[in-house]
Each structure stands twice: as structure tokens, then as C-alpha cells.
Amino acid sequence: MKILITGSHGQLGTELQRIIATWVAEIGKVSDNIKNAEVVAVDVDKLDITNLEQVKEVLNKEKQDVVINCAAATNVDGCEANKDFAFKVNALGPRNLAMVCEEIGAKIVQVSTDYVFRGVGDAPLNETDIVAPVSSYGKTKLWGENFVREFASKYYIVRTAWLYGYKGHNFVYTMMKLGKDKESLSVVNDQLG
């Protein structure tokens, strides 16, 4: 099996590479199918997913069985400030990958977000809950999901929430850094994840 990971320098792409290389994840062991896989990891400098011709070129060259799309515009405030960029990366990029995956017979794993939901309520979300994004980030990620459903016949959509890891600026990283610098911290306590 050959796996292509996009967004390889980001938080999730980096962690996926580590998990596959070490065969161990925080939640348990990695499948034997994955252990023997050849992994090709690319970032925007090698594969701009918003460029359909480049997607065709790279995916046809690599001949992967599975594409895991970790490439995304994830800065929520940045997506509000630059909606066109967010749409290109979070919607058109997955569309391009899905179209080419369908042409070459590869599966696509589209990483999405809980921001596709409204973000209100007092109970944890379920994947069957109604989607109704309120932010540009959530809307563009939902467009990406819908494009994958429309253009690929072999796909998985994984909605994440509260990603954290050894790389990147995330909630855990921020709290640990602030904990070293401050005597006390105040954080919201009304969010479910």
C-alpha cells in the first residue's frame, strides 16, 4: 500500500508521519496494513492542492492507494479575514484531490472539523447531527466535505475537534507555555469537545 499525506509540515500531517514511522499511536497500535505502507508526505511547496494541474501531476506520478488530506487553512480568524483563500484551500483543494483520486482509483481521507456544526448546545456532538456552520472556516470545510462526496466514490471524512500534539500552536501547547509564565490562568469552561 502507498499513502500520500498532504499538509505534511502541519500539526496533523507531522503527527501522522510519526505514528506511521513508529507504528504506535496514543490510542493503540497501528494496523499491520499501515505498518508496511510506503508513505509519501508532501507540503504546499511540493503540492499546492488548489492547483488542479499540479494535483494531477503529483498523484499520477506517485500512484498512491490512499490520499490523506491534512492540508488546510485552519486559522479560524484568518479564514474570516481572507474568505477567498479559505475557500480555495478548504473547499477547492479537497475537490481537486477527490477528482484526481477518482480518476486513478485511490481512496481519499478528508480531514474536516467540528466547526461544520453550529457550536451551540450542552451535549457532545454526533456525526449525524445537522451541519450548520457559522464561520467562514466551518463553511469552507463543509464545502470541502461536500466536494469529496460529490467527486470521489471511495472516501472517508474525519471530523476532528481540539487537535493537539507535539508540534504546532494548540490549546495544550498554549496552556503549558502560559503556565510557565503566569501564576494563574483563566480559561473558558463551557466548551464541549
Model regions: which residues?
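N-terminal Rossmann NAD(P)H-binding glycine-rich loop of SDR-like oxidoreductase domains
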Residues: 1-26
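Catalytic helix-loop patch of NAD(P)-dependent Rossmann-fold dehydrogenases
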Residues: 88, 92-96, 116-158, 162-163
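NAD(P)-dependent short-chain dehydrogenase/reductase
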Residues: 146-193
